[in-house]
């Protein structure tokens, strides 16, 4: 069933501009309080100018362009400007450091980068020291360094016409994005997302929260994440609603922003809910128009009840991952909700619990959560240049193995139990234990290392490192944490260190992580 009518993203934006014209499409608020507003007509024109900018820089259909940006209008311009000319966006987590960013550049084959002055020194170093295909950098800031191969994004964009100059043939099967996501291996994998995936995500996520064109969808989620793109932005635009993109989350500012923009829908992760709850009570706590708060794992029933009672909101649970594009299991609009269930499978999806032999399990039995969709349409197409990893999780008939455990009840409600092996959920970010262990193992004083997630009252899980030192060595906490801060993104740095004489292992020599939690 083709529910998108064969429409790729270029056609979507041309139609939205015609239908909604001067209606507000996008509002962006920077950390400094600067607010930019665009109507559907104006936003489509900015997208066209950006597409023309890329064309003048030699970008053609199939080329990859990396974005290393915080939440800003330029991210939206680039995302859809690239899609209009058949080029491919490669968003990079804005919190990654040099080594991690360089690896994504190398493995995505990106030939152009759009970033800000904040991140430029890192990429200048990457160009000098790492082998990449990067040939040009566009900076979104006004002031430019006197370097070759660097241009002003804004200056070049504003020189372009508002009508599209290059419009190659497009198909909904064309790749629109490669989104690198942390996995249980030491390196992230590039999730290939098509035009169809994004168009479907818009319709599906709009259905999930019964979105209308008079709604205002506000998010503080980072634009480089799938939930901001597919649960929020694509849903809002597909419904002709207003999308509000806030640059950075602030617990003190959040409710003021919800009230200021008269938001009717927003999305939260547990870290946000917990930090909002520790703010001083205010008479304005319930002075808002929110009817739904899209919510992603994991919260206790007491936390949920306290939050909903204090702020007068409803949580609409949604379960998914980058590979599923949207929240494929979740609460439905107008349907009953059964906490702590994560909901039921949405339309166009089947869901099962399977055992270790890939056999379906009956209600009440615990196993792996598996999802059936259509690759390249309702679930991701593949991992970029990684057929082995693709085959490991995606069956030929469209069944996707999530690696998460859970069970379902007799009425089809699913319940999540635990995260996939070796993953830590920290304040909305997925962190691979293996990746951290490989980095920490390079410290000259460390003989053995294991990293685990432990419960954290604010950020879901904190990261704890257990290390065995080389004989005769000593290691202070200060030295250890300084080493980590210099070699990994801040959100990956462990919070705790424990030095041990040995680590628990099973008979095959594998570390028994559960004994350390």
From Swiss-Prot:
Provide any one GO MF term from the record.
Answer: carnitine-CoA ligase activity
Please name the pathway.
Amine and polyamine metabolism; carnitine metabolism
Give the catalysed reaction(s), semicolon-separated: 4-(trimethylamino)butanoate + ATP + CoA = 4-(trimethylamino)butanoyl-CoA + AMP + diphosphate; crotonobetaine + ATP + CoA = crotonobetainyl-CoA + AMP + diphosphate; (R)-carnitine + ATP + CoA = (R)-carnitinyl-CoA + AMP + diphosphate
| One Gene Ontology term from the biological process aspect of the record | fatty acid metabolic process
Which keywords does the record carry? Ligase
Might you give the EC number(s) for this enzyme?
A: 6.2.1.48
The keyword Ligase is annotated on this UniProt entry: yes
Which Pfam families is this protein grouped with?
AMP-binding, AMP-binding_C
Q: So what family is this one in?
A: Belongs to the ATP-dependent AMP-binding enzyme family.
**What is the documented function of this protein?**
Catalyzes the transfer of CoA to carnitine, generating the initial carnitinyl-CoA needed for the CaiB reaction cycle. Also has activity toward crotonobetaine and gamma-butyrobetaine.
For this entry, the protein name equals Crotonobetaine/carnitine--CoA ligase
Please give the organism.
Escherichia coli O157:H7
For this protein's source organism, the top of the classification is:
Bacteria, Pseudomonadati, Pseudomonadota, Gammaproteobacteria, Enterobacterales
């Amino acid at each position: 069933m083709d529910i998108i009518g064969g429409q790729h993203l270029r056609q979507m934006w041309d139609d939205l501009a015609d239908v909604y014209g001067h209606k507000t499409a996008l509002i962006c608020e920077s950390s400094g309080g600067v607010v930019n507003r665009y109507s559907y007509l104006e936003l489509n024109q900015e997208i066209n100018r950006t597409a023309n900018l890329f064309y003048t820089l030699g970008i053609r259909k199939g080329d990859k362009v990396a974005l290393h940006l915080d939440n800003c209008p330029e991210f939206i311009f680039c995302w859809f400007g690239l899609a209009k000319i058949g080029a491919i966006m490669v968003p990079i987590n804005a919190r990654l450091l040099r080594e991690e960013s360089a690896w994504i550049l190398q493995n995505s084959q990106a030939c152009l980068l759009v970033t800000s002055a904040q991140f430029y020194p890192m990429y200048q170093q990457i160009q000098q020291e790492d082998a990449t295909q990067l040939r040009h950098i566009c900076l979104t800031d006004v002031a430019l360094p006197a370097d070759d191969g660097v241009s002003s994004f804004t200056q070049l964009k504003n020189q372009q016409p508002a009508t599209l100059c290059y419009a190659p043939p497009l198909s909904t099967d064309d790749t629109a994005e490669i989104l690198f996501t942390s996995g249980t291996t030491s390196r992230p994998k590039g999730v290939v997302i098509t035009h169809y995936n994004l168009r479907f995500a818009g319709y599906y996520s709009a259905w999930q929260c019964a979105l209308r064109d008079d709604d205002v969808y506000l998010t503080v989620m980072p634009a480089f994440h799938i939930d901001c793109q597919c649960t929020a932005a694509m849903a809002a635009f597909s419904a002709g609603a207003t999308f509000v993109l806030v640059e950075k989350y602030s617990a003190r500012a959040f409710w003021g922003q919800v009230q200021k923009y008269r938001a009717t829908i927003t999305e939260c992760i547990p870290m946000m809910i917990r930090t909002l709850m520790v703010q001083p009570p205010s008479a304005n706590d319930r002075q808002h128009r929110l009817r739904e708060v899209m919510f992603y794992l994991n919260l206790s029933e007491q936390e949920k009840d306290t939050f909903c009672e204090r702020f007068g909101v409803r949580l609409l649970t949604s379960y998914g991952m980058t590979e599923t594009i949207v929240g494929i299991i979740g609460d439905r609009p107008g349907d009953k909700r059964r906490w702590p269930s994560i909901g039921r499978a949405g339309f166009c999806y089947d869901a099962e619990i399977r055992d270790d032999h890939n056999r379906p399990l009956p209600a009440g039995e615990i196993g792996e959560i598996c999802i059936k969709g259509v690759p390249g349409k309702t679930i991701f197409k593949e991992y970029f240049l990684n057929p082995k990893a693709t085959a490991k999780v995606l069956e030929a008939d469209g069944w996707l193995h999530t690696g998460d455990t859970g069970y379902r009840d007799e009425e089809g409600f699913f319940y999540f139990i635990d995260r996939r092996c070796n993953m830590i959920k920290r304040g909305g970010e997925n962190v691979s234990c293996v990746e951290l262990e490989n980095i920490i193992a390079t410290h000259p004083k460390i003989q053995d290392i294991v990293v685990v997630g432990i419960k954290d009252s604010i950020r879901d899980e904190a990261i704890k490192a257990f290390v065995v030192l080389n004989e005769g060595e000593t290691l202070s906490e200060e030295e250890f944490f300084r080493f980590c801060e210099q070699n990994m993104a801040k959100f990956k740095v462990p919070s705790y260190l424990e030095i041990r004489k040995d680590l628990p292992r099973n008979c095959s020599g594998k570390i028994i992580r559960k004994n350390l939690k």
